[in-house]
């Protein structure tokens, strides 16, 4: 049986003090909240928080779920951009947060929420052309954080998930919640690895999207580590990107045993399967020939709180005999 049990948000939140930005305001009464001031470097931006932010906006689902996993819904004044359904454990909390836009909000809509902190999941959340760059926000007195999967660095993995949760927990004054979540997440991954002991890895091609080319998971993103820990071998691990394009000729040459389909957006899993099955050029690819498909929601395969549980979910599909 695979492990997945999202940490339920705490019922009682630590009281939030004055808003933090750059420059940060002073805490109430001049006394620092426990754990503050807190200085963190994130994707090249260093910020000192004098107190937990109290008017946060999240853009992109996986960072929204980080906040909800830590019981921080009362710190949210807005959210935007879902890829798929919010986890059931977080739905009630999510429904209480104003949705600023179906995708990214305009600069005007974002500023109208009067945030003191903006948390983006992808670099596109901080689009300079749309007036939402981190520098733009800083000039407006708003602190920001970018999910570390999109920082210019090396390959990311589950340790980066734990660090992301820890840093967000510290930023909002709830480090104990972050530590509790991480302990549970690590235990689940360990349990999956134990039951896979002795199984031979299967070769995996991730099909995210694409027609003329295949948009796939490369070796730098967390999706690559999820495959490895779930008992697979990413056939495009040599692609030096989180996501990137591969030719269909490369897919054929690398002969994947299983195709993992990322589920999101308006194109359904069945439509993606049909595109692969109907392509005569892919007919002899083992995964296509044997109709071996696995499915993960996109939100499972990015750097967020779903990633540790996704190891077990994917392992069940790659190695059903080891369930």
Placement of each model-derived feature along the sequence:
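Bacterial Sec-exported substrate-binding components of ABC uptake systems
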Residues: 1-64, 170-207, 317-323
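Extracytoplasmic/secreted envelope proteins and their assembly/folding machinery
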Residues: 50-53, 60, 64, 107, ...
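A short, structured surface patch at a secondary-structure boundary
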Residues: 55-113, 117, 122-126, 235
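Short secondary-structure boundary segments
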Residues: 60, 122-125, 149, 239, ...
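Extracytoplasmic ligand-binding site segments that recognize negatively charged/polar headgroups
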Residues: 85, 124-132, 142-167, 200-222, ...
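Structured C-terminal subdomain patch of bacterial secreted/periplasmic proteins
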Residues: 155-164, 170, 258-323
């Amino acid at each position: 049986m695979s492990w997945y049990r999202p940490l339920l948000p705490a019922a009682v939140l630590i009281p939030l003090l004055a808003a933090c930005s750059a420059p940060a305001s002073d805490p109430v009464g001049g006394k620092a909240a426990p754990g503050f001031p807190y200085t963190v470097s994130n994707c090249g931006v260093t910020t000192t928080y004098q107190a937990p932010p109290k008017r946060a906006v999240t853009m992109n689902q996986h960072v929204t779920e980080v906040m909800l996993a830590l019981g921080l819904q009362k710190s949210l004044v807005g959210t935007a951009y879902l890829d798929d359904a919010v986890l059931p454990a977080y739905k009630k909390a999510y429904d209480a947060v104003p949705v600023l836009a179906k995708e990214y909000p305009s600069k005007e809509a974002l500023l109208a929420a009067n945030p003191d902190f903006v948390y983006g999941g992808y670099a596109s959340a901080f689009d300079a052309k749309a007036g939402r760059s981190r520098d733009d926000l800083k000039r407006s007195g708003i602190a920001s954080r970018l999910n570390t999967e999109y920082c210019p660095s090396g390959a990311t993995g589950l340790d980066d998930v734990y660090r992301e949760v820890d840093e967000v927990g510290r930023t909002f004054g709830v480090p104990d919640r972050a530590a509790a979540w991480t302990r549970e997440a690590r235990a689940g991954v360990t349990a999956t690895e134990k039951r896979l002991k002795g199984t031979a890895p299967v070769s995996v091609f991730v099909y995210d999207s694409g027609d003329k080319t295949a948009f796939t998971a490369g070796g730098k993103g967390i999706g690559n580590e999820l495959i490895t820990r779930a008992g697979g071998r990413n056939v495009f691990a040599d692609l030096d990107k989180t996501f990137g394009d591969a030719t269909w000729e490369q897919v054929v040459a690398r002969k994947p045993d299983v195709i993992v389909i990322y589920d999101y957006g308006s194109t359904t899993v069945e439509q993606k399967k049909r595109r692969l099955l109907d392509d005569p050029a892919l007919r002899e690819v083992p995964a296509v020939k044997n109709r071996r498909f696995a499915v993960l929601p996109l939100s499972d395969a990015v750097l967020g709180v779903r990633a540790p549980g996704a190891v077990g979910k994917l392992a069940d599909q790659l190695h059903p005999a080891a369930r």
